[in-house]
Amino acid sequence: MKVFKFGGASIETVERARYIAELINDYRDEKVLIVISAKGKTTNALEKIVDAFYAHNISEAQQLFAALEADHQLYADQLLGKRSDALSNKLTELCTEVEWVLSEQHDRPYAYYYDQIVSIGELLSTSIMAAYLNQIGIAAEWIDVRDIMKTDDTYRDANIQWNKTESLAKTVFEKAFKQYNLVITQGYIGSTDDNTSVTLGREGSDYSAAVFANILDVESVTIWKDVPSLLNADPKLFPNTVPIEEITFHEVIEMAYYGAQVIHPKTIKPLQNKDIPLYVKCFLDKNLKGTLIHNTTKAIQYPPIMVLKTNQILLQVNTRDYSFITEDNLSKIYTLFHACKIKINMIQNAAISFVACIDSNPERFDELLAALEKEYDVKRNEHLFLFTVRHYTQNILDEELRNRSILLEQKTRQTIQMVVQ
């Protein structure tokens, strides 16, 4: 058995959805669990509906949702030629869930309403794709993942209840695979014990695919993207990127830790634990080799892997009485960062000072600054960049740092980090 995950970009247009169907058809004789995200731009549209609803602009929220529902109906008609009664009823049934929410007087936290509304995106897209596959003769079963993925009620970042999810996944999926080779479900969403919808947070669709791969002991996972492979840098920021054909789970986690927009570490863990290889391939050209991510002991020669984080703040915290920055002071400072939910990207301490590079987040930063200034003198530089290079060479540093001023630098055998302006 394999697991495929398709992101929203892969089905954003009717043309792409048809191409994805052709790709899936190549695997119709194999057992494949297919995890599909919301159609491209749908989640952003749903977030606007949540914002309008929570701001008490109920009429605006209802109008925006009516437009989104009409968009999906049109998409389905264009894809299928004409919607079947079964699909029309399914879409109406799903949309009614959100309409009920939008008719309520809200008295719960924003995150609760976010999950009830945003979760509809994956359900609509998968319903349409499953109907289309069956219409063109590719038999596929549609499953509501909320009947399987059980979580706590941490809305927008729910924690999976592994034992319940494992039991349900094995029961439901194994029953489906006895009748079908292809099973379609959703990523990113789940439900609590009382069947309240939740979302799984950042990279939730990839994570869903990895969780089910772990539970079902599949042979591989493939994430289909609109890029040819993993690259050594963001092509929007670095013009001369090169593909990475093979990489270890450990190296991907290192890349993600330093801020690379690759596979999230929480997606890697369930796969690494079961030694399940992960492929990143291009849905625009299925014949491209892509990238293999796996456990291996062989030496891999990597190109310099570069990450540039923008909008950084360099914060210097000094003791007022010239006392040393010892474990006691460090503990106090770390506690304040944790309380303000601020992640430190790079740190360095000297005798009487502590320096940290952090993402700019005005609301949280102001809270942190106020707390620090009660006991310490604080200086800051803003609008900076954090430049990280794994497997660096002097040539690449000379090329990329031309006309840059380095404010802080740390270097190990394989990694160099610099705060620059």
Where are these regions (language model features)?
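Conserved dinucleotide-binding and phosphotransfer motif residues
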Residues: I136, K274, C340
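Electropositive, surface-exposed helix/loop patches at the edges of structured domains
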Residues: K175-T192, M255-V280, L315-L330, N381-E400
